[in-house]
Amino acid sequence: MKRSIHAIASCALVVASAPSWAQTGEKPDLSGNDPHWIEDTVSQCWAANPHPEGNENISWSGACEGGVITGPGTLTWSQNGRISGRDEGTFKDGRLTGKGRISTVDGASFDGEFPGPGVLTLPDGSRIPAQTVRDSTGWTIEAPVPGERTK
């Protein structure tokens, strides 16, 4: 999960997800060998991590199905021992699905549908109509040019 402001400032934020193994017919490699899956070592639930970085950890407050985060809950991301962001909503196959919210510690957030419309809020409080779309690595938040902000 990328939790950097430069991603939000450019109006594209990558959110935890990966191609659904339900769609591909292949189960995820939950052995720890695939860096695109990350495990909450307390709950022993795995979440999709399409853009892995070093020293990442997650904490999941929800259910597991087949070892993968499922249903309503909060996924908290940390890097180098510091919280970097949260994903809140309903998860399926290890990724946020339906109505949800992602937020970063610097105050940026997206509230909306996965996939679908929502509002991207920048750290300065500016609000931008946006939408989430699936791409080859997960969710991308697309927004119009920053001049179309609402306050």
Q: Which residues fall in each region the model found?
A:
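Glycine/tyrosine- and acidic-biased, solvent-exposed loop/turn segments at the edges of beta-strands
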Residues: W21-K151
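N-terminal signal peptide c-region/cleavage motif recognized by signal peptidases
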Residues: S17-P19
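Repetitive helical segments and hydrophobic/amphipathic motifs
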Residues: C11-V15
